[in-house]
Amino acid sequence: MIDQMRVFDRALVARRRARAVASVDQVAPILEDAADRLLDRLDDTTRRFTRALDLGGRGFVAPKLAARGIPFVVSADLAPGMAARGGGLAVAADEEFLPFAEGAFDLIVASLSLHWVNDLPGALIQLRRALAPDGLLLASLPGLPTLGGLRNALAEAESTLRGGLAPRISPFPELRDGAGLLQRAGFALPVADAEEIALRYKSAFGIFADLRAAGEANAVLARDGRIPPRALFPMAAARLGDGAIDLSLRLLVLTG
């Protein structure tokens, strides 16, 4: 039986992030947009930050923090090569077991990097401890209904082909969960809001390619380990219709 606290295969997540070092620039426009939207929150404060942690930014966050005049920026990632993309001090670190001292940073930014964590409240507690008492956390995760159409198309195709379902897309939180997660982790002024990034693909296969390029392929422990039926993805693509496919990436933004 799978431990209820272990939803994701972290070793597989690490391997996929390591492989994605060579391909992640394929999705640079999406990750740049997500990072910019998250860092826009810094414009709402007059606070000057001096010690920042970029957690899982894949090379798209650390340079933006440095450009804002923050003198000390650490990039941390489960994959050493991905951390090195930040261009500065790089640390290989597991989001579930952070190696940083209490109060080490006055700013922590986690852009689309916490959704493969098994114990999200526990990870947020560790992030709070790594913050100085007056520090700021900015985090974003994909939230529902991100990839809802793709999820439904895959489920319908698999049900048709195999008569049952296997989880093929990571479970995402809802906006209503956000502030509660921060509150449970001990953040005094938790705020959760959402933003939408509109995406358009020529076909469903472009979606699959971008997910792989970003290291975001299925890592759910309960996934079906068998090779998918050859017809699965073409059938799912057909259910999404012909022509361009419009999707929305919903960013659940946590500020604490």
Where are the predicted features?
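Class I SAM-dependent methyltransferase Rossmann-like catalytic core
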Residues: 1-47
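Conserved Class I S-adenosyl-L-methionine
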Residues: 23, 27, 188-256
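Class I SAM-dependent methyltransferase SAM/SAH-binding core
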Residues: 40-101, 107, 121-125
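Short conserved AdoMet
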Residues: 47, 118, 132
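Surface-exposed loop/turn positions
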Residues: 50, 104, 131-135
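Short catalytic micro-motifs in class I SAM-dependent methyltransferases
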Residues: 112-116
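A short glycine-rich, Lys/Arg-flanked "PGG" loop and its adjoining helix->strand segment in the class I
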Residues: 121-136
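Conserved catalytic/acceptor-binding region of the Class I
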Residues: 138-202, 217-223
